[in-house]
A protein has these predicted regions:
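Active-site metal-binding loops of divalent metal-dependent hydrolases
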Residues: 84-86, 120-122
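Loop/turn elements at helix/coil->beta-strand transitions in domains of secreted/extracellular proteins
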Residues: 7-11, 75-80, 112-116, 138-141
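Sequence/structural signature of outer-membrane beta-barrel proteins
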Residues: 48, 88-89
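Structured beta-strand-rich core segments of catalytic domains in phosphoester-bond hydrolases
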Residues: 1-78
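A cross-domain feature marking catalytic cores of carbohydrate-active enzymes
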Residues: 15-16, 83-85
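Metal-dependent phosphoester-hydrolase catalytic domains
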Residues: 33, 92, 96, 103-117, ...
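Short catalytic/ligand-binding loop motif for oxyanion handling, primarily in non-cytosolic enzymes
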Residues: 1, 19-24, 89-90, 125-128, ...
Length: 177
């Protein structure tokens, strides 16, 4: 759907299964505006380079993070984006997944100092204890803290839960959400 409807964009990422199919945590970026400098997809697990791997106690679905480093051709700035879909069933898997993403971003010796945007469906609410991981990373700020409910369109009903997040580090200015 993304590739068919966002023709001015490239969509990068791969499927989460061992065969690199199924759901993706893709990143879409405008072709004319961004230069892709680096891209990686890794599994949220103790073996991040093994396709389809999972944390113990996690749901049956493997979870991934797609990361990319871009150069904004208009602004001349470099920044990193990480997009993920954390586990829906395992509290420990969500906590470890978020920690893994933030640590992975920090451990990059080449692009480690660039501004970072971490986005995704974290499958947790802002006040859940899994979000305490953020206390270990005070250089990251949750800029979606007060935006209210996010809507994904999968089901109808009265679910008033905010489970989608945008966490930033560095000189990031958000003009709209």
């Amino acid at each position: 759907w993304l590739k068919e409807n966002l023709t001015d964009y490239y969509v990068i990422g791969c499927g989460r299964s061992a065969e690199l199919r199924d759901e993706q945590s893709a990143i879409a970026y405008r072709k004319e505006r961004m230069n892709l400098m680096k891209m990686d997809t890794y599994w949220l697990s103790e073996t991040p380079d093994v396709p389809g791997s999972r944390y113990p106690g996690q749901s049956v679905c493997p979870r991934i993070c797609t990361e990319a480093v871009f150069e904004d051709l208009e602004a001349g700035k470099v920044f990193r984006v990480a997009n993920a879909h954390l586990d829906n069933a395992g509290e420990l898997a969500r906590r470890k997944g978020l920690e893994q993403i933030l640590e992975n971003v920090k451990s990059d010796t080449f692009f480690g100092g660039v501004p970072v945007i971490v986005t995704g469906d974290f499958n947790m609410e802002p006040d859940w204890k899994e979000m305490e991981v953020m206390k270990n990373h005070p250089d990251f700020t949750n800029i979606t803290e007060n935006i209210g409910v996010t809507y994904h369109g999968y089901w109808k009903g009265n679910d008033q839960t905010c489970i989608d997040f945008m966490i930033v580090r560095g000189s990031i200015r958000c003009e709209s959400l």
